[in-house]
Amino acid sequence: MSDEEVEHVEEEYEEEEEAQEEAPPPPAEVHEVHEEVHEVHEPEEVQEEEKPRPKLTAPKIPEGEKVDFDDIQKKRQNKDLMELQALIDSHFEARKKEEEELVALKERIEKRRAERAEQQRIRAEKERERQNRLAEEKARREEEEAKRRAEDDLKKKKALSSMGANYSSYLAKADQKRGKKQTAREMKKKVLAERRKPLNIDHLSEDKLRDKAKELWDALYQLEIDKFEYGEKLKRQKYDIINLRSRIDQAQKHSKKAGTTPKGKVGGRWK
């Protein structure tokens, strides 16, 4: 056999030995091992059961000293009373402090109220003085204006009296103008009085009042319509006047450039 074959045989032999060592033992051997372990643990259980238990005994009170339960209870009651008294004292102190704070707050409120009333009084007095001053200034201005008007009227009268006969015609024209204004004002009042009829509704029933209200509403609605129509008509007329004026201005500009005199208003008359 060569050296390589010898080495191969030795390796196979070694592998078989390793496999035998790693294989588990037979069942009989395993059972014996468990029995040995069980036998080893049994003495420990016996020892635990045989351990003696300690005996419990009541504490002994020294024979030389006696315990006074009444004294202990009295001390406890005194301690509770002291704590209760301390709580009562702290409560009354807090109550007293709150009352003092409340009194101080009321005093501050009253003081602030008095200060506010004084400020309002001073403000009202200043406002009254200001109103009086304004009234005095207004009266003074009115007096000065009346005096100035009187002086102007006197100057006008003197100037007119110096004109002689023309003064009477001037007064007549002035009276005529005043008469026209007065007549127009009276006519306006008359027309308004005719249109504004008295409203007698005290004797009307509910249905008639409803009809009257509807009638007034219709009249008011018609007046609003007329007002709107007149306003639109006035706008159109103003627009037409503006257009006419612009056309006249344009015509005058062209005529000036051409050197001709257009037909227009001269001396208050149209040519």
Curated annotation (Swiss-Prot):
Coiled-coil zones: none
- Indicate whether Acetylation appears among the record's keywords: yes
Compositionally biased tracts (Acidic residues): 1-21
GO terms for MF: actin binding; calcium-dependent protein binding; tropomyosin binding; troponin C binding; troponin I binding
Composition-biased stretches (Basic and acidic residues) = 29-53, 62-74, 113-155, 183-192
According to its record, what are the GO cellular component terms? troponin complex
- Give the source's domain of life in one word: Eukaryota
**Residue span of region Disordered:** 1-74, 113-192, 249-271
Output the InterPro entries linked to this UniProt entry: TNNT, Troponin, Troponin_sf
Among Pfam families, the record links this protein to: Troponin
List-wise, which residues carry Phosphotyrosine?
Answer: Y221
* Biological process according to GO: regulation of striated muscle contraction; skeletal muscle contraction
Which keywords belong to this entry? Acetylation, Muscle protein, Phosphoprotein
Q: Which residues carry this modification: Phosphoserine?
A: S2, S90, S161, S168, S169, S205
Q: Which residues carry this modification: N-acetylserine?
A: S2
Return the similarity comment: Belongs to the troponin T family.
Function, as annotated: Troponin T is the tropomyosin-binding subunit of troponin, the thin filament regulatory complex which confers calcium-sensitivity to striated muscle actomyosin ATPase activity.
Its name, as the record gives it, is Troponin T, fast skeletal muscle
Record organism: Sus scrofa (Pig)
